[in-house]
Amino acid sequence: MDDFPLISMFFLATSVLVGMGIGDTLYFRSLKLVGTVRGLLLSNAYPLFTAMIAVLILHEPLTVGLLLGTTFVIAGVILVLTSGRALVKQQGPAIDKGEHLGMVLALLAALCWAITTSMVKVGAQDVDGLSATAVRLVVAAGALLVVGRLSPVGLQLRQYRGRHLAGTVAAGVITALCSVTFLLAIQFTGAAKTATLTSTAPLFGVPMSLLTGEKLTWQTVMGSIVSVAGIWMVVAG
């Protein structure tokens, strides 16, 4: 870590603040204003924003496979997210200002995540994945500690005992592993492809729905097929 470039540390640390501090805050606020489904759908513009930044600023190649694959993945995820759910229509002739604001916040959250992914790509160029991940996790832990201290209810660490403590530790370990794989994916495949592939997270809920006895809808099946086709295009392209 002694030879860790300061510019890399800056981009990696700032990426956490932009993604978690601003992006996640805007996203959770948008969910309160427009609801879960519409918030998820609008924030799903994240891969498109990332591809634009990656191509225009980071000079990553724009291939037909990436373009078509990203479109297919987003369409498939939208089908999965809307399966079995009805978008609640706003009563009255127009959408109120709160919903307009919520839509804007969801899109801004997606833009923040795109900027975060791009900053990670820049910051991780000249360092190894584990060191880069360590920087991001330390900054994230420090930021959460400060937020917890400033919170009216405080950190409340004493309530984490037994199963709660084990679950929290397990979640932390999984988060660390995911952070490593996410950063390595950006290093080896680029920001645009990584953003597209990581946006398929809702698809992993499909097998879980089978285990819990939920009924599969045609949107879920078609969405999964379309997304898998999109993933193949991105990887092959």
Where is each model-derived feature located?
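Juxtamembrane helix-loop-helix junctions in multi-pass membrane proteins
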Residues: 1, 115-142, 190-196
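Membrane-interface interhelical linkers
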Residues: 1-14, 24-34, 75, 82-104, ...
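Hydrophobic residues within alpha-helical transmembrane segments
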Residues: 10, 14, 18, 45, ...
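Residues that mark transmembrane-helix kinks and helix-interface sites
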Residues: 20-28, 51, 74, 81, ...
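Structural motif at transmembrane-helix junctions in multi-pass transporters
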Residues: 25-42, 125-131, 180-197
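Alpha-helical transmembrane segments of compact multi-pass small-molecule transporters, enriched
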Residues: 42-56, 71, 139-143, 178, ...
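Juxtamembrane helix-loop boundary signature in multi-pass membrane transporters
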Residues: 48-111, 210, 215-237
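Selected transmembrane alpha-helices and immediately adjacent juxtamembrane segments
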Residues: 98-125, 130, 169
